Amino acid sequence: MPVLVVNVDHVATLRQQRMGKEPEPVTAAHLAELAGARGIIVHLREDRRHIQDRDVEMIAATLNTRMHLEMAGTPEMREIALRINPHIVCLVPEKREELTTEGGLVVAGREKELAAYLAPIHARGIRSSLFIEADPAQIRAARNVGSEYVELHTGHFADAATQDEMRRERDKIVRGVELARTLGLKVNLGHGLNYTNIYEFKNVSGISEYSIGHSIVSRAVLTGMEKAVAQMAAIIATFSE
């Protein structure tokens, strides 16, 4: 059965608006765990716009489930990953001017570079994932890098303006899941998924994890973190394996 991993970046976004001490993303991570999240995601961006180094360190030290560290493929971030020892490192592209991650990592043509970058991480026993588009060339390239997981970008599906466009994007993702599984990769989905559109994947098999943050944090503002996480976890519990 697929599981829910919760991204707490936007708890930190709210805190950083006032450069204060609350809301505390570490507390949010613990509440998400108590409510049924099977893992916590933090994206430590190079510009530190939301999650800070102390957040990563404290969550890594106190979490009872798994911590996923999203990061750009830079020497600094690799050094942090090797110090923190998260369960999984997920490489994502970054642009300074973007509000959020806008697309998948380009892997095709960079297999040797990315494999070399990840080698010390793998040697430490840390698993890796690549955040990519549901594109056959990128999925095949990801296998050659040696990552155990891919996370397929669902943002274009979530942002679709029409039902036809949404259906096309969904079908592309489903084909991507099937190809990745055929190649021996574990598959996660993430970006823009919410309490409504996630049902489009209810009967899709082969998905290991759903990575969800913004919609859960948005609901948590109104209902509380535990209730928001529990509601999403209950939805995913009905999905195909």
From Swiss-Prot:
Q: Matching InterPro entries, A to Z?
A: Aldolase_TIM (IPR013785), PyrdxlP_synth_PdxJ (IPR004569), Pyridoxine-5'_phos_synth (IPR036130)
Question: Might you give the EC number(s) for this enzyme?
Answer: 2.6.99.2
**Listed SUPFAM superfamilies:** Pyridoxine 5'-phosphate synthase (SSF63892)
Subcellular location as annotated: Cytoplasm
Top-rank lineage group of the source organism: Bacteria
* Species, as recorded: Oleidesulfovibrio alaskensis (strain ATCC BAA-1058 / DSM 17464 / G20)
Query: What role does it play?
Result: Catalyzes the complicated ring closure reaction between the two acyclic compounds 1-deoxy-D-xylulose-5-phosphate (DXP) and 3-amino-2-oxopropyl phosphate (1-amino-acetone-3-phosphate or AAP) to form pyridoxine 5'-phosphate (PNP) and inorganic phosphate.
Name of the protein described by the UniProt record: Pyridoxine 5'-phosphate synthase
Any one GO MF term held by the record is: pyridoxine 5'-phosphate synthase activity
- Report keywords, A-Z: Cytoplasm, Pyridoxine biosynthesis, Transferase
- Ranges in coiled-coil conformation: none
Assembly behavior: Homooctamer; tetramer of dimers.
Give the family, as the similarity comment puts it. Belongs to the PNP synthase family.
Q: Where is this site: Transition state stabilizer?
A: 151
Catalytic residues of the enzyme: 43, 70, 191
For the ligand (1-deoxy-D-xylulose 5-phosphate), the binding residues are 9-10, 45, 50, 100
Indicate which residues the UniProt annotation says bind 3-amino-2-oxopropyl phosphate: 7, 18, 192, 213-214
- Cite the Gene3D superfamilies for this sequence: Aldolase class I (3.20.20.70)
Name the top EC class: transferase
Query: Highest lineage ranks of the organism?
Result: Bacteria, Pseudomonadati, Thermodesulfobacteriota, Desulfovibrionia, Desulfovibrionales
User: Catalytic activity annotated for this protein?
Assistant: 3-amino-2-oxopropyl phosphate + 1-deoxy-D-xylulose 5-phosphate = pyridoxine 5'-phosphate + phosphate + 2 H2O + H(+)
| Gene Ontology biological process terms from the UniProt entry | pyridoxine biosynthetic process
Query: What pathway annotation does it carry?
Result: Cofactor biosynthesis; pyridoxine 5'-phosphate biosynthesis; pyridoxine 5'-phosphate from D-erythrose 4-phosphate: step 5/5
Which coarse location class describes where this protein primarily resides? cytoplasm
Recorded GO cellular component terms are:
cytosol
